[in-house]
Amino acid sequence: MLNSIIPDLNFIEYGGGQIAYRESGQGPTILLFHGMNGSSKSWASLFNSLGDKFRLVAWDAPSFGESDVFGDSIEDYTNAAKALISSLEVEDIIIIGHSMGGLIATRLAGDKDVSRAGFVLSSCHLGFGRPKGEALMSRYADRINALTEREVDMSYALERAQRSTPEGTPKHVREYLVEVAKGARMELSLIHI
């Protein structure tokens, strides 16, 4: 059901690879940055509910969804996001970042070269990165190890969907989140956030 309302993928060339994104609607531009294990599909309900009032652009961060693998730091992701913004030729964007996407959104909000009209953070944190060689916090290391050990299987996807939704979440929403989580890739173990 939610899959039927998301727009097709578009791509820009960047860093020797491609960044995937979805775009629809007209009006002020809202740029959407998903969290870890997410993708542009994470924003399906917004495409449905806001697409008639806003131009929505949701990316697949590098190493997520259909974007190519490159870069392993928030700085790398922020530079990729700036390339996407530049390719869209927009000013006064509204930036929305969820979880890991909030780290990127925060960097963009503080960048004098990014023209923005608004800024929204959802379920964000200051970042729990560690110097190279130092262990990640256990909750992030456990998520990455789960991907590494069993790749992405149905049990991993079900676990992620259940942990990220409250009791009483409609079945079709959880099923969609399972589909999004199944798209997580092994390359996530390389990311330094």
Predicted segments, located by residue:
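Structural signature of beta-strand start/N-cap positions in the alpha/beta core
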Residues: 29, 55, 91-94, 115-118
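Conserved small/polar residues in nucleotide/adenosyl-binding loops
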Residues: 191-193
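Flexible "cap/lid" loop of the alpha/beta hydrolase fold
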Residues: 106-111, 115-149
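Active-site loop/oxyanion-hole signature of alpha/beta-hydrolase fold enzymes
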Residues: 45-48, 57-96
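Conserved HGGG/HGGXW glycine-rich cap/lid loop of the alpha/beta-hydrolase fold
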Residues: 17-66
